[in-house]
Regions:
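Noncatalytic modules at the cell exterior or secretory-pathway interfaces
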Residues: 30-37, 80-98
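Edge beta-strands of jelly-roll/beta-sandwich modules across compartments, strongly enriched
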Residues: 95-108
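Exposed aromatic-hydrophobic patches
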Residues: 21-25, 73-80
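Short glycine/proline-centered coil/turn motifs in the loop regions
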Residues: 42-44
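Conserved Ser/Thr-centered positions that define the repeating blades of beta-propeller domains
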Residues: 51-53
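Transition segment at domain starts
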Residues: 1-30
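Tryptophan-centered short beta-strand motifs
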Residues: 20-23, 56-64
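Solvent-exposed serine/threonine-rich low-complexity stretches and specific carbohydrate-binding patches
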Residues: 8-12, 61-70
């Protein structure tokens, strides 16, 4: 299966609290997802959870990635995900400042 890319400009302000990225439909036949988040100015670590759904209504957690306040990007590879829809849940926790600027994805 050829690679498929998606770039999402998030511009999520941590000060606004917990958030979700929009739903993303997985390309047909894709089972592996690589996600890289770009961010800046975090004053505490932030948690991002990949969720999956077959009906785009009921989402379940698959994997969690930590956005380390001392870095500016974080990448996770999730293998063997058989689903139609995904979304990302962002939990700011103790963080009050910073921005998540981009979410870059590769599917295969």
């Amino acid at each position: 299966m050829p690679l498929s890319r998606k770039n999402i400009l998030c511009n999520i302000e941590i000060a606004d609290g917990d958030a979700y990225l929009d739903y993303i439909q997985i390309p047909d036949g894709s089972m592996n997802i690589t996600t890289q988040f770009a961010y800046s100015g975090l004053d505490a670590d932030v948690t991002v959870t990949l969720q999956q759904s077959l009906d785009c209504k009921n989402f379940d957690d698959v994997a969690t990635i930590l956005l380390d306040k001392d870095n500016t990007s974080s990448t996770v590879n999730v293998l063997d995900v058989l689903t139609i829809w995904i979304r990302y849940r962002i939990v700011v926790g103790a963080a009050h400042t910073g921005t998540i600027s981009e979410c870059n994805l590769i599917f295969n």
